[in-house]
């Protein structure tokens, strides 16, 4: 029996909800531990889902939600490759959450961290679940902005402010490169679903250009 894709989508929704809850809970003494405990539970659930998908050698699972571009919606898919990275990322997220339950109490300005940490985890997972160019780029940019917010949590430190500026410039360049790559993959018909892109027969020159753009976009 395949792991339902709803597990991952509900997990992402829970992480986004925890991000919202981080705003009022940051003012409470126990708020830090509550947020990190929540992200720990969600990360372990998604880690288990990814691992089960791999161990059972399940067929790809997919879902389309009535969001995003009107003619394709928001497409999500889990196959063996994405399940592997879901397991890896959520293993790291669970470890970071466990560490944060203790270390987070020393944070002087938790309101600058607690809303963005769960949102960043949600963004990373959404990137792996995305099955169309629009959803991928939206998730990618959301992940980039929330990670930038975490970098800037200690913005009064000069090195942090400079690092945040460099990161934002590089992330914007990366998004532009990925946007161009998806445009080439979509072709003149504008098929932004990944299934449509996979079906396209690209010339060697276009394929090489797409590879270069993806390496630039992901590497930045």
Residue ranges and their predicted role:
Residues 54-73, 135, 142, 175-220:
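Juxtamembrane/interfacial segments at transmembrane-helix boundaries in multi-pass membrane proteins
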Residues 19-29, 94-107, 149-159, 218-220:
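C-terminal ends of transmembrane helices
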Residues 36, 40, 59-124, 211:
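Hydrophobic alpha-helical transmembrane segments in multi-pass integral membrane proteins
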Residues 6-13, 34-35, 84-85, 125-147, ...:
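Hydrophobic alpha-helical membrane segments of integral membrane proteins
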Residues 26-43, 80, 105-119, 131-137, ...:
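Membrane-interfacial loop-to-helix junctions in multi-pass inner-membrane proteins
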Residues 14-15, 22, 42, 85, ...:
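Hydrophobic residues within membrane-embedded alpha-helical segments of Major Facilitator Superfamily
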Residues 18-55, 61:
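Hydrophobic alpha-helical membrane-insertion signals
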